[in-house]
From Swiss-Prot:
Domain PRC barrel: 114-190
Classification via PANTHER family: RIBOSOME MATURATION FACTOR RIMM (PTHR33692:SF1)
Organism for this UniProt entry: Acidovorax sp. (strain JS42)
Pfam family, one: PRC_RimM
Record's comment describing the protein's domains: The PRC barrel domain binds ribosomal protein uS19.
Location within or outside the cell: Cytoplasm
Subunit composition and interactions: Binds ribosomal protein uS19.
UniProt keyword terms in alphabetical order: Chaperone, Cytoplasm, Ribosome biogenesis, rRNA processing
InterPro entries: PRC_barrel-like_sf (IPR011033), PRC_RimM (IPR056792), RimM (IPR011961), RimM_N (IPR002676), RimM_N_sf (IPR036976), Transl_B-barrel_sf (IPR009000)
Protein name, entry field: Ribosome maturation factor RimM
Amino acid sequence: MPQLPVLETAELPSDAVEVGRITDAWGVKGWFKVLPYSSNPEALLAAKSWLLQPAEKGAKSFFAGTVLLPIRQARTHSDSVVAWAQGVDDRDAAEALRGARIFVPRANFPVAGDDEYYWVDLIGLPVVNREGVALGTVRDLLPTGPQTTLVLAYEHEGKPHERMIPFVSAYVDKVDLAGRCITVDWQPDY
């Protein structure tokens, strides 16, 4: 019978962000493969421990609730991340984690550089144009090739609508995270 890792129960902090999921074992020494939800998995790689929850739908898991997984090593590998964790010492233990969702507290993310933003910080921000006209609230961001696009949700005549604005300096004048607002050079009829 395979030896399953012993994981410490933990509370999921209110600022926890889902950053990826464990997809498979990698090798025979307990390493496992992770699908990061960002093209730049910096927050995942910088964390000394991850919070895991079982897969949402249908997958079997040997643990319930939230558990703490101390990370020994993590690095990028092609378009994924491979990691090795404390207590995960062979392929069977790594396979037992398959499907687990990975969370990291937002407070533990590395500091973003100038004019760099974590998507999680932009979602929910109201967007106004230079004239102060409300254009909507950021509902999502889409990678659209050379740039990212803001997806705004707004209502018009009582019906929900979407508006898309390229997230580039030609249209985005200011992102004020402290003031919780994005100002753009955009009109409601675009």
